[in-house]
């Protein structure tokens, strides 16, 4: 007589355990803390705006506004984050924005070169300065913090020397007619306009540049051997070198990428405002580092997230515009910035310790 053996019923808690495991793995991602920060910032300023009787923060135009603000520095934040994951800093990226803008202004307005050529010249010169930064760091072994702190001042001085020797002013206007008729000029000044309740809101090309750079950075970090190299170099340069990773080449390439992103941002700002100013970009280096830290990047290298950095940029954009929409004194922005940075570091450290090994 045949017997039938019943299959053991699945444990009632097994599905729940799998769900918890998935949740833990999601929380173990470097971007988890940044996502929590973004949600928290949005809720806080949504409530403040509501209490102040201004609901603009909750509207689509309001969202376009803070996304545009996030995109501006977000353009340089992704390369800065990758460089930090590799264990290095670039404090010169802010002054590089001003320098590249001045080069564009001088070439286009003073020398009469085509806008597209002026932008390309600025990009090439910026990349050369980035390569010099990287070369000095890898050849001397000096901390990149010190090297780029020095080049920050050198590049800012170069911008001042250029403007004083050519125009005697720190501001150079660029003709809007030439911008609109030039292919690169038209690209960097492009925008999409939307009408909501009779009011026009603009979505500038900077948003698409930011998203494109972030997507490329995320792909490189997560899907290519360069991503493994970047993380390995930041975690242990000696071990990475022993495994055949071209440590010097990786670091120099990242410094060049950071400088290129500064030139891209300078091109956008110069075309948007139809001018160049040596003061433009000042302080952007610290804002970009803040975005990266909020996004989960360790100051010691070897760990971080491009997606988290993008969320960090969004959080700062929300905070900056949320203060405006809530009619709060603008001086509170720096208090909010410091609070977000400290909160993000504490939260990210807790997440790393709590969910270590689950990634």
Question: Which role fits each region the language model picked out?
Answer:
Residues 255, 262, 266, 272-338:
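Transmembrane alpha-helical segments in multi-pass inner-membrane proteins
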Residues 1-47, 235-238, 242-249, 319, ...:
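Cytosolic-side transmembrane-helix boundaries in multi-pass membrane proteins
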Residues 41-51, 59-111, 135-142, 290-306, ...:
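Single transmembrane alpha-helix segments in multi-pass membrane proteins
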Residues 31, 144-145, 171, 202-209, ...:
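Loop-to-transmembrane alpha-helix initiation sites
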Residues 145-222, 253, 276-278, 356-359:
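Transmembrane helix-bundle core of multi-pass membrane transporters
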Residues 112-153, 311-316:
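Alpha-helical transmembrane segments within multi-pass membrane transporters and channels
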Residues 34-47, 80, 153-160, 207-219, ...:
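Hydrophobic core segments of alpha-helical transmembrane domains in multi-pass membrane transport
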Residues 113-114, 118-122, 128-133, 198-275:
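Helix-loop-helix "hairpin" substructures at the membrane interface of multi-pass membrane proteins
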